[in-house]
């Protein structure tokens, strides 16, 4: 309405679409295992038995 367009009530459809798109963008980067804080003193590829 401020720029000559028709007035309309805000609605959740736009918000839902934006939230769904954001969740889809982040999905490939979510961790597959729980985060475990650690200090790396040894660098290399270790087997589970070596760890």
Swiss-Prot record:
The active site is at residues 11, 38. Keywords: Hydrolase. One of its GO terms (molecular function) is cyclic-nucleotide phosphodiesterase activity. Its EC number is 3.1.4.-. The keyword Hydrolase applies. Substrate binds at residues 13, 40, 43. It is an enzyme of class 3 (hydrolase). InterPro entries: Cyclic-nucl_3Pdiesterase, Cyclic_Pdiesterase. Belongs to the 2H phosphoesterase superfamily. CPD1 family. This is Cyclic phosphodiesterase. It comes from Triticum aestivum.
């Amino acid at each position: 309405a401020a720029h000559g367009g028709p007035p309309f009530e805000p609605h959740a459809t736009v918000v839902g679409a934006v939230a769904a798109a954001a969740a889809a963008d982040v999905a490939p980067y979510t961790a597959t295992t729980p985060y475990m804080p650690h200090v790396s003193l040894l660098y290399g590829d270790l087997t589970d038995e070596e760890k």
